[in-house]
Amino acid sequence: MSWRGSAGGIKAAKLGHDVIMTPNSHFYFDYYQSPDADAEPFGIGGCVTIDKVYSFDPMADLTPGQQAHILGVQANLWTEYIASDDHLEYMLLPRLAALSEVQWCQPGVKDWVRFRDGFRMDRIYSQMGYVFAKHIFGIKGSYAVDPQKGAVVMTLTTQGDVPIHYTLDGSEPTAASPRYTGPVEIGKSARFRATALREGGENASYSREFAFSKSTGRPAVLNTKPNDSYTFEGASLLVDGYHSRPVFTSGAWLGYLDEPLDVTIDMGGEQSYRSVELETLAEKGDWIFPPSSVTVWVSDNGTDFTEVASVAVPEAKAGDADGIGRYRMQFPETSARYLKVVAQNAAAIPAWHPGAGSKGFLFVDEIVVE
């Protein structure tokens, strides 16, 4: 069984061994069903949405002969944090239906939009009295940084041909609000809210708050490589204006293991700035620790950099609270075009931790420049 990712299972199949694929990244059903963990029943951490379950390809990069060694897929629902049958059912459903399609659908038939728009298992769940998550009926929002415009572009989808209306000021969308007809360009701080108005049914809602700083929407380049499991959208996650919740698998955090964070942001050279703040995450039970230091550099040509600020971070203690840490550094006002932020990983996991001496993860999110 390949639990910690897919690499072990793929390697085993290539060596001629039979494999069951059950990677935690896609099939741990004790992970939250939504990145909005505060609105979900309690879970062990992480996030596995139903569309992420569906997206898994257990036979990727294998020849037909090697594919024969993939016996199937399996989901795991560890019950340390499952308090009742209702809680267990909620964590299973409807992700179990998505898992079934991963197992049984031929590649030519498997299609997320078909599955989402044709999903009717909720009727059976209700008839049987099961408790289940309803995120498949919700609004799926995704966004990307447009460095040419210095903006964030929001894209929305939902089940079926249902009208979506949105606002940018945090007010509740109504049928009189602008109707979503295509990607929405956001060029300044906004409280984006959207509602899918379902006739005779429960409306779906989506919200995302963007807090723009002078770095938001700017071109950014990673000079070091994040861990393959936690690369997601890359450097743009650091300059998208969204301050993520403390869920490291939500797709809004970059995770580093073998290298430090080293990112260069093109500030354009048109406006001055004098402070930088970096957001990081600590989840000691998942081997995620604060950085050991954060350093800021500036340059006019993108080649020759000068250090302007740094902060040393004490080694984490067992009693330190997990969650988001913010490291803010001030320096003499500059209009240097290029800004570099380097966050060093802790040298090793502290002696008090079960993973003592091993490498810990460094997770980073927004870089705020003012």
Positions of the model-derived regions?
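Solvent-exposed beta-strand/loop surfaces of large extracellular or lumenal domains
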Residues: G170-R179, V308-D322
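Aromatic, loop-rich ligand-recognition surfaces of beta-strand-rich domains
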Residues: R245-A309, V313, G323-E370
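Active-site lining segments that contact anionic ligands and/or coordinate catalytic metals
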Residues: G16, A68-G72, A151, T181, ...
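Short, compositionally stereotyped local motifs that mark structural "simplifiers"
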Residues: K110-T264, L281, P290
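Short loop/turn positions at the edges of beta-strands in beta-sheet-rich folds
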Residues: R4, T158-G160, K188, M267-G269, ...
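Substrate-binding groove of N-acetylhexosamine-processing glycoside hydrolases
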Residues: M1-I164, S213-K225, E233-A235
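Beta-sandwich strand segments
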Residues: L96, E202-A204, A351-G357
